C-alpha cells in the first residue's frame, strides 16, 4: 500500500493546488537580497521571482514577473521604498507591498501606510513571522510591527524629524 502524498500547506485535502505567492525583493544590499530570497524559497507556497537593487527597477520588474507581493527596503538608490510604494499603488498592478527595513520608526511606518503599503516590518523580524506576514498580506490583510504600531499610537501620526522628512 502506497502512503498518501505529503500535505501541501497551500491546499486543502481534495482541492486543486494553488500557485505559489510570487515575490519580488528590492534591497540595495545584495547579501540581504540573496539571504531573504534563499530563506523565502524554502517555503512551499512562496516563490521569489525577481530581485532588484534599486527603487527605479521595481515597477518594471513587477510588470514583467506578475508579482503578488513586493518586499521593499526604504533606503535604496534612485527611488526610495516609500516613493516606489506610492508608484506601485498608483499603477494598480495588483501587487501588495511589504516594507522590510532597518528604519523602525513610527514616522516611516505612517508614511509607508499612506503610500499604500500593506505591511511594515523591521529586518530583525523572525523568519517565520516574515513568511506569515507575506501570506496575510497576499490574502488581503495588513501586518504592522507591533512595537512600531504601539509607538505610533503614543507619539502621533508623524514623529519624523525634519531631516527624516
Predicted feature descriptions by range:
Residues 68-70, 74-75:
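The short loop immediately C-terminal to the conserved phospho-acceptor aspartate in CheY-like receiver
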Residues 107-114, 118-165:
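Short, flexible helix-to-coil linker/hinge segments that flank and couple to helix-turn-helix
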Residues 53-57, 77-83:
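Acidic catalytic/metal-coordinating carboxylates
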Residues 45-53, 61:
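Short hydrophobic/Thr-rich beta-strand motif most characteristic of the beta2 strand and flanking loop
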Residues 103-104:
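Short, conserved "switch-loop" micro-motifs in signal-transduction and mechanochemical regulators
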